[in-house]
């Protein structure tokens, strides 16, 4: 999971 995308 990429929370900085």
From Swiss-Prot:
Its main location: secreted. Disulfide bonds: none annotated. The keyword Secreted applies. Expressed by the skin dorsal glands. One of its GO terms (biological process) is defense response. It is found in: Secreted. Keywords: Amphibian defense peptide, Secreted. One of its GO terms (cellular component) is extracellular region. Shows neither neuropeptide activity nor antibiotic activity. This is Rubellidin-1.1. It comes from Litoria rubella (Desert tree frog). The lineage of its organism: Eukaryota, Metazoa, Chordata, Craniata, Vertebrata.
